[in-house]
């Protein structure tokens, strides 16, 4: 079995159905003795260029290990699903399990924002404590 990295660009109106779509594709891979090594939902992002007059879309990345027949079936499902604007399948030498650069940067942003909000809450508590002393 070979390793593949799959990126899907889904129509923004279908963002609610992304979870169901991805679950269906993962089930297909697992039913055919494949494995899913990584799954990342990148969310709604700006496209580099408009596709069919659409400027934003929902991105999903997953790394799988499957045979050729399963991959062909997946690609056919991608092709005939109107919600999928574009799909990209790249063969990889090894399974990739660590988070992508995009996911790492998103985690770092969340980590930087968390202390700020905690400081803001502490500042408000300090102000309320100052008022109670008077």
UniProtKB/Swiss-Prot annotation:
Q: Which GO terms describe its biological process?
A: translation
Gene3D superfamilies given in the database record:
3.30.70.60
Sorted keywords for this record are: Ribonucleoprotein, Ribosomal protein, RNA-binding, rRNA-binding
- Annotated InterPro entries: Ribosomal_bS6, Ribosomal_bS6_CS, Ribosomal_bS6_sf, Ribosomal_S6_plastid/chlpt, Transl_elong_EF1B/ribsomal_bS6
Name under which the protein is recorded: Small ribosomal subunit protein bS6
Positions of the UniProt region annotated as Disordered: 99-134
Asked if rRNA-binding is a keyword of the record, the answer is yes
